[in-house]
Amino acid sequence: MSLSEQYEEKVRPCIDLIDSLRALGVEKDLALPAIAVIGDQSSGKSSVLEALSGVALPRGSGIVTRCPLELKMKKSRKADFWHGKIKYEDYEEEIEDPADVEQMIRKAQNEIAGTGMGISDKLISLEVTSSNVPDLTVIDLPGITRVAVKDQPENIGDQSKRLIKKFITKQETINLVVVPCNVDIATTEALKMALEVDPNGERTFGVLTKPDLVDKGSEETVVSIINNEIVYLNKGYIIVRCRGQQEIKDRVSLNETVKRERDFFEDHPHFRTLYDNRKATIPNLAEKLTLELVFHIGRCLPRLEERIQVKLSETQAELDRYGSGTPTEPEQRIYFLTDKITAFIQDVLNLTTGEEVKSMLYMNIFPDLRKQFDLWKNDLDSVGETFNKKIEKEMKAYEEKYRGRELPGFLKYNTFEVIVKGQIKQLEEPAIRRLKEISDLIKREFSQLAHSNFPGFPNILKMAKTKIDNIKQVKESETESILRTQFKMEMMIYTQDKTHHDNLKMLKSKEEGKERQKLGVAHSPSHKLYDHSDSEGIREELTCHLKSYFSIVTKRLADQVPMVIRYMMLQESAAQLQREMIQLIQDRHNIEELLKEDHDIASKRNNLHSCQKRLTEALKYLAKF
C-alpha cells in the first residue's frame, strides 16, 4: 500500500496542526515539533529541498539561505496542480508560477536581512501545494560558512552557527544533516554541530548527496555510512542524487531528475543494494521524513498541551502584575493608585507574619531570619565555650594582680563582677552585627516587594524604595540603641535568687557527676567538691558561680536580642512603611507624577496579551485535533 493511501487521512492533519500553531506564532513562546535542515556550504542542501518541493530555491556563492525558510509542502489530489504562498513579518502574497519562487524568496530575504549578505533569525514561510510534493514541512537553515565573502560580516560564521543552534538545540527538532559523499563525514561541521546537541544521535537523520562524485574505490565506505557502520545515527541515513550544475544549466526538469536518479541507483554496482533497501532516492527520503515527522508530532503533542497550559498560567500571572493599564478618569486614577499601594502594603504585612505574599509566590523571610538568629546563638555558644576554657586562668591572673590585704580563702564579689562583665561585653558587637545583617535582609525583601508590586511605575517604585531606605536607617539606629541599653542593663548583674540557686545547684550536680566518673566512684566522694580550704578551692567555687550566671545571661540574650530585632526591624518597619505609603494617597498633588508609566510597559503588556491570545487559540486547535 502506498504512502498516500495508508497515511493520507492522518498525515496531513498532524502536519497542518503544527503548521497552524507555528503560523499563530506559538514558536515565540514554545518549541514546536519540526525538521531542521542543516549542511555545510556546497553540501547539496538546496538541491535536496528543490527535489522535495519541486521549486527552485536561491543559489550562488556564500550564504544564500539568509533567513530560516519554513517550507510547507501539501500534496494536492488535483492532477498537475500547483499553488504557492509566501509569508513573512506582516506580508503575504500568493504565487501562481513556480518559476517566481526563487525571486520571491530573495526579495523577502532582502527586506528582512537587508540587501547585503547578512542573516536574520526571522522566519520566511513558503507554502507549496502540488500534486508532485509530499505532505511535509521542513525548516531550511543558513549553510555553515567558515570564511566571509564579499559583503558578509567578518563574524558571519559565528552568526550562522548561533542561528542554527537556536533551532537544533531544541528537543522538539529533528535535525536533517546534509553531507556530500565526496568528503570525510567525520569532519563535516554540520554533523559535528548536530551531535554536539544530540550526542546519541536520537533525533538526527543523515542525507548523503552527490554520489556521482565519489572517487573510485570509496563506494563501499559510502555504503558503510548509509548502513550506519561509521557514525551511528538512531534515525539512520539515506542517499540521494539531485541535479548537478550542468543539469541546472541545461534546465533539466525536476521530473526528469527523479527518473535519472532512479536509473543511477538501479544501475550502480555498489549503490543498487541501497536502492533495493529503500535507503536511496528523493521519493524514499520524502516518505521517510513524512513518517518521522508525523511520529515525532504524535509523541510531542501530549507534552505540548501541558507546556501551553503552564505558559498560559505564567503569562496570566505576569499580566496580573502589569495590570490593565492606568485609567484616564481622575477619580479612577485615585482608586487605581490606592489599590496598588494597598496591595503592596498587604504584601509587606503578610511577609512580617509569614502569610502568603500575592505578588511573589513562595516568598518567606522567616527561614533567613532563623538562620541569622541561629548565628547569634552560635556567637553566644562560642563565647561561652571560650569563657569556660580560660575562666580559671583569668581568675588566677586577676587574683595575682588585684589581691589586696585579705587572707587567702576570702571570695571577693568584685572579682565575680569584673569577670562576668568582661564576658558580657564580648557579646555586644556580635549582637550589633546580627542587627546589621537582618536590617539589610529586611530592606532587600521589602524592595523586592516594591519591584513586584509597581512594575512599570518608576516614580512609585522610587518613592517606595526611598521610604524603605529611610525607615531602615531610622529603625536600625533605634534598635541599636535598645540593644546597647540591654547590654548596659546586663552590666548590673541581676537574676532572681531562686533562678541563680537552681542553676548553680544543677551545675554543681553535673560537675560532681564528672568528678565521680573521673574518680571511678559510684557514690559521692567523702569530701564535697568545693570544700577546700586553699585558694584553689575558692577559685573552683567562684568558677561554678561564674559559669552558672553566664549561662543565665546567654539564655536571656538568646531570646531577647532576636525579639528586639524582629519587633523593631520587621514589625515596626512594616507599620511605619504602611503609614507613609498611605500618606502618598492622601497627598493628591503627587498622583499624576506617581502614575507616570514606564514607556516600555505598554509594549510588554501588548506582547503578553498577544501571547495569551495565541496560546488560547493553540489550545483550541489542540482540542479540535
From Swiss-Prot:
Residues 539-625 form the GED domain. SUPFAM superfamilies: P-loop containing nucleoside triphosphate hydrolases. GO terms for molecular function: GTP binding; GTPase activity; microtubule binding. Residues 29-302 form the Dynamin-type G domain. Residues 140-143 are annotated as: G3 motif. Induction: By interferons. Gene3D superfamilies: Dynamin, middle domain (1.20.120.1240), P-loop containing nucleotide triphosphate hydrolases (3.40.50.300). Residues 209-212 are annotated as: G4 motif. Residues 64-66 are annotated as: G2 motif. Residues 39-46 are annotated as: G1 motif. GO terms for biological process: defense response to virus; receptor internalization; synaptic vesicle budding from presynaptic endocytic zone membrane. InterPro entries: Dynamin, Dynamin_GTPase, Dynamin_GTPase_CS, Dynamin_N, Dynamin_stalk, G_DYNAMIN_dom, GED, GED_dom. Residues 241-244 are annotated as: G5 motif. Keywords: Cytoplasm, GTP-binding, Nucleotide-binding. GO terms for cellular component: cytoplasm; microtubule; nucleus; plasma membrane; presynapse. It is found in: Cytoplasm. PANTHER family: DYNAMIN (PTHR11566), INTERFERON-INDUCED GTP-BINDING PROTEIN MX-RELATED (PTHR11566:SF225). Belongs to the TRAFAC class dynamin-like GTPase superfamily. Dynamin/Fzo/YdjA family. This is Interferon-induced GTP-binding protein Mx2. It comes from Ictalurus punctatus (Channel catfish).
